[in-house]
Amino acid sequence: MPTIKQLIRNTRQPIRNVTKSPALRGCPQRRGTCTRVYTITPKKPNSALRKVARVRLTSGFEITAYIPGIGHNSQEHSVVLVRGGRVKDLPGVRYHIVRGTLDAVGVKDRQQGRSYGVKKPK
């Protein structure tokens, strides 16, 4: 415990909260351009080829974003919308690409779980 004299000399520093998605700069989503689309393998007990894209955002950051869903049309120079949200088994991937907006089309033949940019079936 500090003494009163020590507290007068220099006050307590407030705990600063660190953002988990700094590249978004406090915005809910950001637009960006794909610079490279490729696959990477997940951490240990999992095994797959996860689709990711290197994206240059309008905020100036270059980030790695996950492409969710089965099949995608993203390629180099595609304009995509990026949201926060990490992928637990991919180290360094802290963003998701939003399907169904800009150049990223929704997942084909999707009926349920339509958070993949799919219109509601009539």
Swiss-Prot record:
Full protein name: Small ribosomal subunit protein uS12c
Q: How does it assemble?
A: Part of the 30S ribosomal subunit.
Q: Which UniProt keywords apply?
A: Chloroplast, Plastid, Ribonucleoprotein, Ribosomal protein, RNA-binding, rRNA-binding
The record, for PROSITE patterns, names: RIBOSOMAL_S12
One GO term (biological process): translation
Question: Which GO cellular component terms, listed alphabetically, does the Swiss-Prot or TrEMBL entry include?
Answer: chloroplast; small ribosomal subunit
Can you provide one Gene Ontology molecular function annotated for this UniProt record? structural constituent of ribosome
